[in-house]
Each structure stands twice: as C-alpha cells, then as structure tokens.
Amino acid sequence: MLASSQMTSVSEEKPIGGSLPAVSTDALEDSASSYSLHSQASLVGPRKSGTRTLEEPLLAPLQPLSCNTPMWACRLRSCEKIGDSYRGYCVSETELESVLTFHKQQTQTVWGTRQSPSPAKPATRLMWKSQYVPYDGIPFVNAGSRAVVMECQYGPRRKGFQLKKISEQESRSCHLYKATCPARIYIKKVQKFPDYRVPTDPQIDRKTIRMEQEKAFTMLKKNLVDAGGVLRWYVQLPTQQAHQYHEPETPGVPLSPSPFPMSPLEEEEAIIRDENCVLPSRLHPQVAHKIQELVSQGVGQVYAVRKQLRKFVERELFKPDEVPERHNLSFFPTVNDIKNHIHEVQKSLQTGDVVYNSEIIPATLQWTTDSGNILRETVTVTFAEGNLLKEPITSKMGTSQTQTSLSPEPLPLLSPLSSFQPKIFTHLQALKLQPRLSSPDGSQALVSVNSHPSSSPPGLDTAGNAEANNHSLLLGQSQNLGTDTCLPENSSTASPMGSLPESVQNLVAVDQLVGGEDAEDAGNLEGNVKRTLLGDAHTIPIHILDSHPALVEEDTLSMNQVKQEPNEPTLSTEAKTLLDCKNVSAT
C-alpha cells in the first residue's frame, strides 16, 4: 500500500510541471508525421483537471487468449501466452500480490525466491524492450538492478552447507543424477513514460519510427528527473504444464469456471508433444528433438548445446523477422532445461532406446579446406649404425616408383591417412614425380633403393672416390610391394653403379631432393649417385606439408633437418650439401 500511495503521489505531481507537455509539443511540431503531436496533445487537457489519468485501464491482450486461460492469467494487463507461461503487468504492488496469491492457490505450488533486486543506484538507461518487457512503443527505465526470480520447491538445489552434505552422501552411494523442476516466476519492475510514446503501427515506415524514437530519447535525457512516469510490474507466471519431474498437486480451486473444450491448435500441439517427446516437456517438439540429435552425436556440453539450439531456432525454424523472443522458454530453454534433457537422452542411450549416431558429425566439428587450420603430423625417423662400421646403412621409408598410376596394393595403406589430411590425398590416381636433379648427360640423378629387408648390403662404389667408411642414405620400404624397377640395368643412369648387386638396382626418382641452396651443387654430380652420409643414430623429424606449390598431393613427407658428420673426409667432395627435402614421395 505504501508503494501504491507513493505511485499516486508521483502521478499527481506531474500536472504541476506544466512545462513538460509544452516542450514535447514544441519539439514534435516540426515533425512531418502528425500522429505524435496528437498523442501528446491528448494528454494536455486532463493534466489541468488534476485527476490521475496516466494509469491505463485494463487493456486488451496482445493476442487473443483461448477459452482455457486460467483466471489468474486473466487478471494480468495486456496478457499474452508465451510457451507454458502467461505474461502481463500490474500497476501496483497490491495488484501484484493479489495475482501471485491467486496463482499459488489455483496451482497449489510453493515457491522460493531465487533472486531479488539489490538496492543499487537508480538506473538511467532508456530502453524500448528487454527480456522481461515487450515492445509497446513506450520507453522505460529499470526500477531495479535485477528481476525477481522465484523457483518451484522442486527446483534445482542451490549452494549451501546442506548441499555439501547431500552431495557427499550421494557420491558415496553412487546416487544417479536427479532432474529438477524448471518452472519459474519472473517479476520485473520498470518505470514507463507514456508521454513519449511512439506509434507501433506496422504500416508506418520504420525510418520514421526510428527518428521519433531518437527524438523521444533526446527529450527524455534532458527531462529525465522531472519526467515522472508510471510504475509497472511485469510478471511471467507458469502453468501446470511447466512443472516437471514431480507429482502435480491437486488444485483446490478449479482452473476455470467451466471446462471449456480445447481448441484444435492446442489439441494438435498436445498430440505432437506426446508422440515426439521422450517425456512431458515445455520445450517445442523440434527443439527437444534437436537436443536428442546433438547428444546422440556426442555433443554433451550444456552451453555448446544451447549455442546450437539458438542457431537452429533463429536460422532454421523461423525467418529473421519471425524469431520469437528469448524469454519464450519453449524455443530458448534455460540451462536447467537443457541439463534435464541431456540427462534423459543419455539414459536412453544407455538403455538402448536411442542409438548413438557416430556417422553424422556436426558441421562445427568438420574440417574443411576453408578453415585454414591444417593439422601437421610429425613422424620421427631414426638412422642407426649397422653391425659393421664400413657397411652402408639402409633406412626404409617407402617405395614410390615413377609410374603413371598407383598400383592397387598401396591404396588400403593410403585410405586411412586420407581421413586426416583430405587436402593432401585428393589425387591418388595421378602419382607423378618430377625429378629436379639431373646428371650432365641428361639422365636423372637417382637415389639407390634397397627393396629387400637386408640391412647390410655390400658397399657402394660411386665414381671411384667414395671411401669405405661412408654411410649412404638409401630410401626403401620395409614391406616390398613387388613393383617393377624404374630403369633397366644397362641404362645411362645405372652406369655409375656397375658394381652394385641386383638387390640394389631398384631406383627411385626423387622430387625436389635438394633445396635451393643445393641446386648449384647438383650439376657437379657428374653422373654419380647422390648420397647422404650419416653418423651414429641421428633423428630426423618429418612434417606433412600442403602449402608448397609443387607439392605432390599423395603421401608426402618433408625432412627439415639432416645432420652430417663434420669429421668425414669425403664430405667436402661428394656430399657437401644439406638435404632439405620439401617433398619425398613415400607410401
């Protein structure tokens, strides 16, 4: 009653400040639209009489209500149905208490205050709508820092000493997750300024309405202290359908004077909800099905599910101009609602009612070529010393021959790798390697390959000046695929290796074996086979790349660092270069 008397005094003091209507009328006289002037002029006459006319009568609802609307909802001004709740406003605390008491009596529910406004400094931010206040063309400021939130007695448990004891007991007894009731009551107190109302007719140009809104805000900022205004309490009350996971109480008073039949639209919604939902829910059936789909795909985080639901509602269910407001809990569920639904779907997955769908991957988790985040995979190859110091070392890293097409045997080996790097393994049917190294007589500079599992072949004699204690790097494959040799034994490229046995005659052309700084030394090979001399056990990291312009998009590896022994006497004459292999074709 005290607040009601204060509100009456505020409203009755407004006629004293007669300068406010004059300022508003003069400011709006220059406007091209005349409707703002008429709305302001209609408020000038009653102010001189000294009676309170700013309190609005019981207005018609924003949308027609059905016959089964509860009596407590009919007491709200401008009442509208939002999901399983009804929202309207009251103009006094007495009216608000009356509606809340009537609602509790008819629903037989007990509520606890979860959140209450704090006595902070008065708000000065002008708004046209908010999460709790719909748009009606009247600007307002919040009269409290926060809204009043009341939860059902079967709602979520809150932090406290008793909660710690209960959580310890449940952890010891391996108690399962218990879903809680999501029903809530929201109360928001605001201060409206009907003197600065703008039209809400959809036929009026939006640009004109925006200009009027800017004018109203400008005048309100200048006269906010003397503007007065009307206090309103916007209330959102849930129905019995909003209560879940507990037995409903038997109402002592009937919800309506007579049992009216349900409308066809409501009956259809009820049938769809019963058929598609795992359990009774206030969520829209398509939203509940989306949660089930996300959880079955492995998305179980609450906020990740909420983000996907918002995108689903705003982009798929509705057009941009028809998206419901965020306070419609049927399409924008709370965190508690999402937790409950995730838990129900997880239980269904365990019992086998819902099958886990691992084939469908969400679009946000799929790697595409436009994402730019290319995964780099590292393979470490260790070159170890042989049994004899004077024998070369053969390291086997794959067999890639200069063929026009890939043989069918390596395809099963490449298929699992293609799932990790789709950009690299897109052209498996056109395996072609272009050699960069060439001998002076036009033949290719080749690297010797030992295709047999023996790790100690006879020593190589290249150009007659290779010493016996040098270790040559031979690229090969531990599993010989049985493909034919690249070049005949009597070819020009095999002539420098006449002393090699037949087991070492398999030759492989290497694409970009030597870096840019080593290209000049490539011409000094004089038909000799390129060799890399290694010491005792060097580890070479190999990275998979796909940004090089001359990259062969098969199984390609890159040697970033190759160490050489500085003590070898023949390094300065035969193997002086550092190998920086951008691409080495390996299977």
Swiss-Prot record:
Tell whether DNA-binding is among the UniProt keywords: yes
Q: Which UniProt keywords apply?
A: Activator, DNA-binding, Nucleus, Transcription, Transcription regulation
Q: Where in the cell is it found?
A: Nucleus
Main localization category: nucleus
Q: For the region Disordered, give the residue spans.
A: 1-23, 437-466, 479-499
Methyltransferase recorded as keyword: no
Biased region (Polar residues) positions are: 1-10, 437-452
What Gene Ontology molecular-function terms does this entry list? DNA binding; DNA-binding transcription activator activity, RNA polymerase II-specific; DNA-binding transcription factor activity, RNA polymerase II-specific; RNA polymerase II cis-regulatory region sequence-specific DNA binding
Q: Mention any Pfam family matching this sequence.
A: ALS2CR8
Q: What Gene Ontology cellular component terms go with this record?
A: granular component; nucleus
Give the superkingdom in one word: Eukaryota
Give an example GO biological process.
Answer: positive regulation of transcription by RNA polymerase II
Domain text from the record? The N-terminus is necessary for DNA-binding. The C-terminus is necessary for transcriptional activation.
User: What does this protein do, in the record's words?
Assistant: Acts as a transcriptional activator that mediates the calcium- and neuron-selective induction of BDNF exon III transcription. Binds to the consensus calcium-response element CaRE1 5'-CTATTTCGAG-3' sequence.
Protein name per UniProt: Calcium-responsive transcription factor
| Organism in which the protein naturally occurs | Rattus norvegicus
Record gene name: Carf
